[in-house]
């Protein structure tokens, strides 16, 4: 990983909620978790969670996928 990308990743993880989200996703493994489950586990409102997920995605730390019910 190059220095610039490392700084971007560490900056994203320096925020408490984003670090908690990242840890949950690492624990969940490759199948991940849906946003609703993450929000419920961390007691984070949907709009706030959406912002933090976008920040993690922009840093290249996660990817999103849509799954129908």
Which ranges hold each PLM region?
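Alpha-helical residues within the helix-turn-helix
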Residues: 40, 57-58
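Beta-hairpin "wing" of winged helix-turn-helix
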Residues: 58-68
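N-terminal helix-turn-helix DNA-binding core of bacterial DNA-binding proteins
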Residues: 4, 9-48, 69
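Short, hydrophobic-biased segments on the C-terminal half of alpha helices
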Residues: 53-54
